[in-house]
Amino acid sequence: MNDFWKSYDITHAEYGADYRCYPLYGTVHLMELAISLAFIVGAALWYRRSSARTRRRILVGVTALLLLDQAALLLGMALTGQWNWGYLPLHLCNINVFVCLYNTITDRNWCKEELYALCIPGAMLALLCPSWLDVPSWWTLINLHSVSIHALLVLYPVLLVAGGYRPSPRRVPQVLAFLFGSALPIYFLNQSLNTNFYFLNDPYGNIITSTFTALLGEKYYILGFLPATALALFLMYLPWAADGKKKKRA
């Protein structure tokens, strides 16, 4: 099989479980980050300067790219006989692909809020600390898919904000309800399928959860998500809370 199609399992068998195709913040990783940033900033500027009709087309186009990107991985793994339950689109970022689709169709504020508060920091962390490097090289379906889909997941809510949407700290309870309401069934699904969606059943292979494990131990690493989520929400809403106070004073 050509290296381009090889899954994590085949890579582990051929290269060893500790193999990584490129180092964090090495040349390849920095180039991926630079290209992603240029793409997001360029698209956001285009969106902001566009008419309502063009904005709608851009949003639909980004949604279509997200769905095609997700489908490409699923088909690639299935057609090469490498598909397993772990490729179900049930990580938080995968689920956000469908939240993007639902928002594009229905234009719901709760979707926009969840995408702003959870999707932006989650997808950004994934790009900054990728957990998909145990593949043969950067030129593989898994790596290209992972980088592109997370860049698109950052872009979509950035477009919403660039188009005038204003997040509100008052909607944080809705965001938390979505997060914990989806995590609970995922936790039990992981138990039955032997998967690791939301990184709730195995801390290893991901830099963030590995850090939680180093601090809290393997048994309690999940508790690390609580302060991490609180910090992410604080940082995401701080600018809007400060802006709201300025307007009240004025």
Explain the meaning of each model-derived region.
Residues L30-R48, L66-A71, A183-Y187, L226-L238:
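Hydrophobic core of alpha-helical transmembrane segments in multi-pass integral membrane proteins
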Residues L65-L75, C119-S131, L179-N190:
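Aromatic-anchored segments of alpha-helical transmembrane domains
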